[in-house]
From Swiss-Prot:
Coiled-coil segments: none
Name of the featured protein: NAD kinase
Gene giving rise to this polypeptide: nadK
Family per similarity comment: Belongs to the NAD kinase family.
Top EC group: transferase
Subcellular localization: Cytoplasm
One Gene Ontology MF term: metal ion binding
Gene3D superfamilies in alphabetical order: Probable inorganic polyphosphate/atp-NAD kinase, domain 1 (3.40.50.10330), Probable inorganic polyphosphate/atp-NAD kinase, domain 2 (2.60.200.30)
Length: 260
């Protein structure tokens, strides 16, 4: 999971639209230089977890490692903010490599929509009526009918986000599993979800779709009126996040399981 990296000297700074993030970017760029994302060895993201997610999506093509510092409200994926010794911190950082989920959603017009999700792919009811979903794993029907507000498939990195709020399990970052979690399940009432191997191919079929429309969301990419949703891990895409020594993502995931 953790790999050594070459000595880093070229940084690109990105920031959210929060004033404190923009002010931090100006100071850090003046102090350490700013080469632009295309020439950077590491991208420094200044904001919260939402901005980190956005930055990871933008780095999919280049796969440039990202070191985040918290200048937002939620900073689970971010390092503590400090302007001192930034190059030393980055060069001593631990690297967590993650793989996104690849979603193919087919809507009511039979149009295919493709997107990648770093945290989760979620299916959500669009109206007051519950959704009805059929779930297949590797071509075999495992749940004939799930009556619910929705369901999601989360990566280890995303297991502490929406998945945790939906009472799904927290997965160690190097866990070779995905979390399949129902959202407010009505039937079967006692079903709490499942842990699937990372190689699993998951298919959701939306039942009674005309009466009970469902949207499919890959992080922030939404497909309305979904009919079928196919999800698998994209092992060909690797994204790297850098964390201060002793504060790795693995340690944060472990600590989260003992938080009040």
């Amino acid at each position: 999971m953790y790999q050594p990296q070459p000595f880093v000297t070229r940084l690109a700074f990105k920031c959210s639209d929060r004033p404190e993030a923009q002010e931090a970017r100006e100071r850090l760029a003046a102090r350490y230089g700013d080469v632009g994302p295309e020439n950077a060895q590491v991208i420094v993201a200044l904001g919260g977890d939402g901005f980190m997610l956005e930055s990871l999506h933008e780095a999919i093509a280049s796969q440039t490692p990202i070191y985040g510092m918290n200048r937002g409200s939620v900073g689970f994926l971010m390092n503590e903010y400090s302007e001192d010794g930034l190059l030393e911190r980055i060069n001593a950082a631990e690297r967590a490599v993650i793989h996104p989920l690849a979603m193919v959603a087919i809507d009511a017009r039979r149009t295919q929509h493709r997107a990648l999700a770093i945290n989760e792919v979620s299916l959500l009811r669009q109206t007051r009526q519950t959704a009805k979903l059929r779930i297949s794993i590797d071509g075999k029907v495992r749940m004939g009918e799930l009556v619910c507000d929705g369901a999601l498939l989360a990566t280890p990195a995303g297991s502490t986000a929406y998945n945790l709020s939906a009472h799904g399990p927290i997965i160690p970052i190097d866990g070779r599993v995905l979390a399949l979690t129902p959202i407010s399940a009505f039937r079967p009432r006692r079903w709490r979800g499942a842990l699937l191997p990372q190689s699993a191919r998951v298919t959701f079929e939306i039942l009674e779709a005309d009466k009970r429309p469902v949207s499919a969301v890959a992080d922030n990419f939404e497909v309305r009126d979904a009919m079928e949703v196919h999800i698998s891990e994209d092992r060909g895409t690797s994204l790297a996040m850098l964390f201060d020594a002793g504060r790795s993502l693995e340690e944060r995931v472990l600590a989260e399981q003992f938080s009040a």
